[in-house]
């Protein structure tokens, strides 16, 4: 009986370890979108990663922030819900990365949106929604 209990304990610990490692490996991945397509944002891609427990989006070095009054980060989840995040342009430069809030459950698309003109400037998609 003791051997069975010990064997079950070892099995349970092994299963927990494997689950933890696979979860951590998934969070360490970098996911890249397709090329941005749109009237003003049509260069570069967006990348999603986790750093220090935070979900981050970054644009690639070849991405050009559109020269519009208020280019803004937007994400669309797998259900089609749109979330408006931060502006690309900030005083003294450009904001080429953004922290995705925890209430955004997954990301299917990344959009560049002009908040002033209320128009979509460009969009890119992940091959499958990232969490």
Where in the sequence are the language-model features?
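Bacterial N-terminal signal peptides that target proteins for export
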Residues: 2-11
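An anionic, turn-rich surface loop/hairpin at beta-sheet edges
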Residues: 79-106
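Bacterial N-terminal signal peptides
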Residues: 10-19
